[in-house]
């Protein structure tokens, strides 16, 4: 995806050297946006391999409302291991906030069900929003939400989604996050009998970790290939009933995996 490589190059060439919580150090750029027309193909980068089982299983896990890594580990997904406690728990992260946000009266709000109802019944609403940034529970989360806030938009029979990501690990995290929310947009569109429109990714602190510099150079030397196509082979009664096997990524051609260490 040229948009992503242009972004990666811009951060590398114009970013500011900054310290960070992990102690590794970053080259950082504040504020950037990319737009992907989902009808042109699925926005899965081709200049390195993305581990699709991790993308799909993590999204299904979020949608289930779970915050224990047991399901992920059972399906060979280890991306949350470093943050979990000895029992595998992560505190009230994405799954809880998406499906079980507690209001001041102690009532549970299922934000995913709420936005589905809005898309179906009030598609012109400017309030079709899911937030994972629950200020009152941040201190209890293993990691505060990086992809914190997303909004849906309906026009001309198409569903679009915009994500705001407050903290963006441009080399490791962003390709994964783009794929995850593009997949969610496809699922929501199918459930609401709409076509897919655009996915817009908006980043706050967009950074390349100092220990990813060589990997970035390798990736920038590669040439993007034609995007894959997503085929959803089943339409369950609920967005919560999809299975991993329901998703087929057709003609995903990619360059070799580039190993890099995640900052903890």
Curated annotation (Swiss-Prot):
GO terms for biological process: dTMP biosynthetic process; dTTP biosynthetic process; methylation. It holds the Pfam family Thymidylat_synt. Pathway: Pyrimidine metabolism; dTTP biosynthesis. It comes from the Bacteria. Its EC number is 2.1.1.45. CDD domains: TS_Pyrimidine_HMase. It catalyses: dUMP + (6R)-5,10-methylene-5,6,7,8-tetrahydrofolate = 7,8-dihydrofolate + dTMP. InterPro entries: Thymidate_synth/dCMP_Mease, Thymidate_synth/dCMP_Mease_dom, Thymidate_synth/dCMP_Mease_sf, Thymidylate_synthase, Thymidylate_synthase_AS. One of its GO terms (cellular component) is cytosol. DUMP binds at residues 21, 126-127, 166-169, 177, 207-209. The keyword Methyltransferase applies. Keywords: Cytoplasm, Methyltransferase, Nucleotide biosynthesis, Transferase. It is an enzyme of class 2 (transferase). Coiled coil: none annotated. (6R)-5,10-methylene-5,6,7,8-tetrahydrofolate binds at residues 51, 169, 263. One of its GO terms (molecular function) is thymidylate synthase activity. The keyword Nucleotide-binding does not apply. The active site is at residue 146. It is found in: Cytoplasm. Catalyzes the reductive methylation of 2'-deoxyuridine-5'-monophosphate (dUMP) to 2'-deoxythymidine-5'-monophosphate (dTMP) while utilizing 5,10-methylenetetrahydrofolate (mTHF) as the methyl donor and reductant in the reaction, yielding dihydrofolate (DHF) as a by-product. This enzymatic reaction provides an intracellular de novo source of dTMP, an essential precursor for DNA biosynthesis. Belongs to the thymidylate synthase family. Bacterial-type ThyA subfamily. Homodimer. This is Thymidylate synthase.
